[in-house]
């Protein structure tokens, strides 16, 4: 009997990749907090998750370095964030407190998905070994 990882892991396998990409975007925002003209960005999580599922659903794999890599940088996935604070005069829209808060929240959600995946993998290993 074949094991369907899509059924076993559900949406959590896709959330890990989207949350990882979001961590990169949020880190970039924090790193550029003092860069004049830098515009804070964020990922439209639901749209990125949907696109990640669709990309994975095609079963595309890069078996050669000449293959094109799939990216989550499609239009609409990474968007500019609307600033909550008034313009400081240099055109930078990064609110460091908001970025740190979002980064922490994203990290906790990533950890939650990772723990869920680990428990699913442990369950599958027990099933394969014949344990309860």
Curated annotation (Swiss-Prot):
It comes from Aeromonas hydrophila subsp. hydrophila (strain ATCC 7966 / DSM 30187 / BCRC 13018 / CCUG 14551 / JCM 1027 / KCTC 2358 / NCIMB 9240 / NCTC 8049). One of its GO terms (cellular component) is bacterial-type flagellum basal body, rod. The gene is flgB. Structural component of flagellum, the bacterial motility apparatus. Part of the rod structure of flagellar basal body. It holds the Pfam family Flg_bb_rod. It is found in: Bacterial flagellum basal body. Keywords: Bacterial flagellum. This is Flagellar basal body rod protein FlgB. NCBIfam families: FlgB. InterPro entries: Flag_bb_rod_N, Flagellar_basal_body_rod_CS, FlgB. GO terms for biological process: bacterial-type flagellum-dependent swarming motility. The basal body constitutes a major portion of the flagellar organelle and consists of a number of rings mounted on a central rod. In Gram-negative bacteria, at least four rings, L, P, S and M are present, whereas Gram-positive bacteria lack the L and P rings. The rod consists of about 26 subunits of FlgG in the distal portion, and FlgB, FlgC and FlgF build up the proximal portion of the rod with about 6 subunits each. Belongs to the flagella basal body rod proteins family.
